[in-house]
C-alpha cells in the first residue's frame, strides 16, 4: 500500500489523478480488495489488519486531497496563461448590418436616381383631396374601403399610400417630371402580411402628350425587377386602379420554389410584386394639366424585403428582435 502514495506523488494532471483514485479507492481498487480479505481472518489478526488498512486509507485520502489541490492550481495557472487578455490591444467595435428595410430602400434609390428620377419627400398627414379625390377616388368610392386609415378631427388623415406626393409634385412643378417617393403609409391592418404602418415606393413620369407610352413603363419595370431579383421570369396581368388607365400588375416567378409550387406562392409559381399603369386623365384634370401623358408605379418595400430575405411574417421587421435582424 506504500506504492499507492508513491504513485500518487508522480501524478501530473487531472486524468492521472482520477486513475490513481480509482486504482486505490474504486469498487475494484486496492483498498476494496484488502477489506474483502478480512473475512478470511479471525480475532486479533483481523483487528490488527483492519486498523492497518484504515491507517493507509486515511493517509492516501489526505495525500489525494493535497495532490488534487496542487494539480487544480497548476492547471488553472496554465489556463490563465493561455487565455491571458492583453488589455492594451485595440478592441474591435462590432459593426451591425443595415436593417432589411433600409437596405431595400437604398437598393431602390440606387437604381432609379442614375436614370434621372428625383427623390421627393411628402408629409405623413394629408387631406382628403391629395390622398383620395385628386387620385380619382371621390367620396363613397368603393376603393376607399380598401384603404381604411386613421382620421383626425380637422378632416386630416394619415396617408394611406405615397401617391399624394405625386399630386403635390405635379402641383408644384411643370412637366417633364421624373420622380420617386419612399416613405411610411398607414392603414388599419395587422396580421402576418400587414401592419398599421408600412412603407411604399412610388414612381411618376409625366411629359408632353405622346412622349410617354406604356412601352416606356414596361421597360423601366422589367429592368428594375431584373436588377432587384436577378434572373426571374415576369408576368404582366391587366388590373384596375382608379388613378391609372390602363392598369397592370406584375408577378415574378417564385423565388422560394422556382415555380415548382409552394405555400408562399399558393402553388401557382408566381408572386405579385407591384402595380402600375398610365396615369388616368382624371388625375391630370384634377391638377389642371393639359396635353400630357405619363405613367406611375408603386410597390410595398416590406413586400420586396420579405421576398429577398425570405421572411414569412412582416411584423418581424418592427419587433426589434436582434436575433432576427442580425440574421440578414
UniProtKB/Swiss-Prot annotation:
Q: What EC class is this?
A: ligase
Names of required cofactors: Mg(2+)
PROSITE patterns this protein is in? AA_TRNA_LIGASE_II (PS50862)
Task: Give yes or no: UniProt keyword Protease.
Answer: no
Keyword Nucleus found: no
Family annotation (SUPFAM superfamilies): Class II aaRS and biotin synthetases (SSF55681), tRNA-binding arm (SSF46589)
| Molecular function terms, GO-annotated | ATP binding; magnesium ion binding; phenylalanine-tRNA ligase activity; tRNA binding
Q: Signal peptide span per the entry?
A: none
User: Subcellular localization, per the record?
Assistant: Cytoplasm
Per UniProt, the keywords (alphabetical) are: Aminoacyl-tRNA synthetase, ATP-binding, Cytoplasm, Ligase, Magnesium, Metal-binding, Nucleotide-binding, Protein biosynthesis
- Which Gene3D superfamilies does the entry link to? Bira Bifunctional Protein, Domain 2
Q: Name where it mostly resides.
A: cytoplasm
Record GO cellular component, one term: cytoplasm
The entry's Mg(2+)-binding residues are: 245
So what does this thing catalyse?
Answer: tRNA(Phe) + L-phenylalanine + ATP = L-phenylalanyl-tRNA(Phe) + AMP + diphosphate + H(+)
What GO biological process terms does the UniProt entry carry, in alphabetical order?
phenylalanyl-tRNA aminoacylation
Tell me which Pfam families the record gives: Phe_tRNA-synt_N (PF02912), tRNA-synt_2d (PF01409)
The cofactor remark states:
Binds 2 magnesium ions per tetramer.
Q: What is its EC number?
A: 6.1.1.20
The superkingdom listed in its UniProt entry is Bacteria
Regarding protein family, the annotation reads: Belongs to the class-II aminoacyl-tRNA synthetase family. Phe-tRNA synthetase alpha subunit type 1 subfamily.
Relate the assembly described in the record.
Tetramer of two alpha and two beta subunits.
Protein name as catalogued: Phenylalanine--tRNA ligase alpha subunit
Origin species, per record, is Helicobacter pylori (strain J99 / ATCC 700824)
Amino acid at each position: 500500500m506504500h506504492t499507492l502514495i508513491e504513485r500518487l506523488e508522480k501524478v501530473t494532471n487531472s486524468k492521472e489523478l482520477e486513475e490513481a483514485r480509482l486504482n486505490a479507492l474504486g469498487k475494484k481498487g486496492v483498498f476494496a480488495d484488502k477489506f474483502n480479505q478480512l473475512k478470511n481472518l479471525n480475532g486479533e489478526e483481523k483487528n490488527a489488519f483492519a486498523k492497518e488498512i484504515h491507517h493507509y486509507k486515511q493517509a492516501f485520502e489526505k495525500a489525494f486531497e493535497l495532490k488534487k489541490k496542487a494539480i487544480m492550481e497548476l492547471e488553472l495557472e496554465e489556463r490563465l496563461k493561455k487565455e491571458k487578455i492583453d488589455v492594451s490591444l485595440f478592441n474591435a467595435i462590432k459593426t451591425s448590418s443595415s436593417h432589411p428595410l433600409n437596405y431595400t430602400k437604398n437598393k431602390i434609390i440606387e437604381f432609379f436616381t442614375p436614370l434621372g428620377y428625383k427623390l421627393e419627400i411628402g408629409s405623413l398627414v394629408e387631406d382628403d383631396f391629395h390622398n383620395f379625390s385628386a387620385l380619382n377616388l371621390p367620396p363613397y368610392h368603393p376603393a376607399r374601403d380598401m384603404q381604411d386609415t386613421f382620421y383626425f378631427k380637422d378632416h386630416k388623415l394619415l396617408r394611406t399610400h405615397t401617391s399624394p406626393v405625386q399630386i403635390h409634385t405635379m402641383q408644384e412643378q411643370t412637366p417633364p417630371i421624373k420622380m420617386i417617393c419612399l416613405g411610411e403609409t398607414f392603414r388599419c391592418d395587422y396580421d402576418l402580411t400587414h401592419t398599421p404602418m408600412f412603407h411604399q415606393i412610388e414612381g411618376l413620369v409625366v411629359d408632353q402628350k405622346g412622349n410617354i407610352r406604356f412601352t416606356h413603363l414596361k421597360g423601366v419595370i422589367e429592368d428594375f425587377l431584373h436588377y432587384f431579383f436577378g434572373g426571374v421570369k415576369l408576368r404582366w396581368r391587366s388590373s384596375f386602379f382608379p388613378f391609372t388607365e390602363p392598369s397592370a400588375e406584375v408577378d415574378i416567378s417564385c423565388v422560394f420554389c422556382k415555380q415548382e409550387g409552394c405555400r408562399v406562392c399558393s402553388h401557382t409559381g408566381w408572386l405579385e410584386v407591384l402595380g402600375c399603369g398610365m396615369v388616368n386623365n382624371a388625375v391630370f384634370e384634377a391638377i389642371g394639366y393639359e396635353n400630357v401623358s405619363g405613367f406611375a408605379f408603386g410597390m410595398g418595400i416590406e413586400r420586396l424585403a420579405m421576398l429577398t430575405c425570405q421572411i414569412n411574417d412582416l411584423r418581424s421587421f418592427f419587433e426589434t428582435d436582434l436575433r432576427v435582424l442580425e440574421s440578414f
